[in-house]
Amino acid sequence: VTITPPATMITGVPEYVDGSGIEVAERAGGRSVNRDRMWHYTEGISNWAPIWPNHGIRILPGPSSMWFDAIGRRLPSPLLPGFDTLATLRHLRTDPAIAQYDHSWFVLSQRIIEKEFALSGSEQNPDLTNRDLALLLKTRLGSGAPGPVEAFKQHGIDFVVAESIDELVAGMNALTPAPLLNAAAIEAQIRDRDLEFDNPFTKDAQVMAIHNARRYRGDRMMRVAKPHRILDPANGPLIGVKLNIITRKSLGGLQTDLQSRVLREDGSVLPGLWAAGEAAGFGGGGVHGYNALEGTFLGGCLFSGRAAGRSMAH
């Protein structure tokens, strides 16, 4: 399988997070391993109010948006919103029909964006960042989309809002160098999925995932929109979101021993140098393998940092 790197990506970390520390350690004799193990996201959008150059924000999606590739084909199961980012990235970069393109698309309704769009970054979540319970309840349970999400819908260069599918697809095509999407084909795929909500025995994996997610009260209240037809004007307007590949983490890094001391190529300890956190692949040079799980990164930082601190103290 041929994997082609994207020609363009947006940046999900500050400009100073560039891996230069690892290169300095290599020049000093340290060994880096597993540099091919990268953790990037497929749901990146350009920040309309950037803090650093090429600043990207990741959408943390609920399960209901329809996901299309660059030429307008619905992504196959289990490549659904919020499921497996690395499997989706692998699909987008290895399918010969689309590997030349660096983007994909969400198509959704206003009702979906109000309930299911969350954005990465502390500045995009003032309710959580400031531990403001009143704002949290208003934002997550009130009407309309959260303020930061609505701001992206209004100002983001990757967002298209329209009342009809023809108008929507025309706007989406305007965001790419050449028109790649066919409105009739997009509409047919959305209509087919819309109809599955009327089928109590549906085998559509995405529809089943939506129903399953709503069995949990927390998701039903705050995270997953009530099943509805995207093409019903009552649920509009329609929204298209151009998704970019966004950089985030390296799962490899400087190889260390159990005391977080950096090792040389021959396996001996490089005196005076320790590595912890992402610089050490979250521990040792790559504790995760080629995949990982959200929520497991911080633990590796804390544990390897603790080991480094204890080693330095002794």
Segment roles from a protein language model:
Residues 22, 31-181:
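An anion/pyrophosphate-binding glycine-rich loop and adjacent beta-alpha core
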Residues 60-62, 248-250, 294:
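Short, small/polar residue-rich loop motifs at catalytic or cofactor-binding pockets
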Residues 178-181, 185-283, 287:
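A glycine-rich dinucleotide-binding beta-alpha-beta segment and adjacent secondary-structure elements
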Residues 26-32, 111, 169-176, 190-201, ...:
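Structural signal for hydrophobic packing residues in well-ordered secondary-structure cores
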Residues 70-71, 258, 265, 303:
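Short, ordered coil/turn segments that flank beta-strands lining enzyme active or ligand-binding pockets
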Residues 1-48, 93, 294, 298-307:
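Glycine-rich loop(s) and the adjacent beta-strand/alpha-helix scaffold that form part
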Residues 279-281, 285, 296-314:
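C-terminal, flexible cofactor-proximal segment of oxidoreductases
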